[in-house]
Amino acid sequence: MEYKVLALGDVASETGLQLLEKKLRAFKKEHDVRFTVVNGENISGSGLTKAQAEALFAAGADVITLGNHTFGKPQIAAYLDEERYILRPANFTGRAPGHGYQMVDCGAFSVAVLVLIGRCDLDFNAENPFTTADKLLKAQTDKPTFTLVEFHAGATSEKLAMAYYLDGRVSALWGTHTHVPTADMQVFPKGTGYVTDLGMTGPIRSVLGIRPEQSVEFFLGGLPGRYQAAEGPCSAQGCIFALNSDTGLCEKVDRIEMK
């Protein structure tokens, strides 16, 4: 049987969150989406608050993922230990609060979600994402119907290499972090659905979610300052993965944009 999974790119502002509060549930119903993963690490610019996480769950997210801005709001650390459906990268060092892998029982099917962070182009102290994926996948005792991997990374080569490495072992793998949607949606030879980057949920007229004039000023040689979220209409970018419960693999990947 086919089940549709929706993955949405980094929510880059409060206005991006507001868009999801208004549109997400109706969109899921219209497209028969059964499971939704949303990257929420940029709602506050850098980081996520407990109130924002609760609002995102209420809007229709089943799992919230985080990346290099996981601890942008330090107070989230304690919440990560108690909220099992907010996932930070699994290859953070062992002392980091929270967890990066979770099994979700959806009744008719089960989903395992794994979050990893890349080591190319990211100044972050993390363990090898490839060996971390191996370790966690091999440790699966109750085999889920589907396994989903979010790879929060800057380098396309690292994301593609991970997709080839995990092809046939996971249902879908998507990238986040760059805030720019890529057009390489595909199903790999052994059945893993893939896209290099989901894109962003945030202001359309922006530079990766921030006010264009602030970014222009920075590149003109201005002093670094506190960036502010851009204003105006928003869109939510991502992909729908059509997964087969008989094989646990992907049959189709479609790009979506919600406005």
What annotation goes with each model-predicted range?
Residues 1-259:
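Acidic, metal/ion-coordinating pockets
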